[in-house]
Amino acid sequence: MTTHELAFGFGYLGAALGVAMVVPQIVRIVRHPSLPGVSPISWALTVFGCLLWFTYGLRSGALPQLPGNLLLVCGAAAVVLLMKSPTSRARRAALLAIGGGLLAATAWMIPTEAVGYLAFAVGTVSTWPQLYDSVGNWRAHVNSGVSLSTWALRIASQVCWLAYALGTSDAPVAVGACVAGLTGVAMFALETAARAPAFGSARVVTETA
């Protein structure tokens, strides 16, 4: 097996983990819809970032980017629509459709490498609202609706994407994977610390997803 083939294997594994990470978050929202702390802005930006990575994969011939990001767009959109929010689901769906359409049109008008770096930029910014909310959860010791399993899978996915990027010399993916992985570690640590003092309490909703 060549280095290139091994790298593609890591890419497909990263894509599979990226798709799987959405499932625990959806399950947690459905089971505990009243829990706060999940950022709809973060998940909406995740939809846009994955749409850009999908377009980048189409234009660059990076096949591992295609199935995972397409499914992740659908999964992240489901999270946005399922979570409790003062904004109606119809309006959220319309905003996702308009934003996605504008980004997709832009992605086909700029150079391929620029699409990769735009996807990296959107992906990086997508974690900031959730990171901000999780800092608040940590300070208030809130057992939030954020799924720890989702962020653990996200970290594992980014490690695989980094291995893919190193094996294929794909700079945009390498930079994006490093930043997303480190942010994921910070998120996981904050949410774990926020829940630690509550262990043993009969009122705590434990991590079931």
Where are these regions (language model features)?
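Alpha-helical membrane-protein topology signature
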Residues: M1-A209
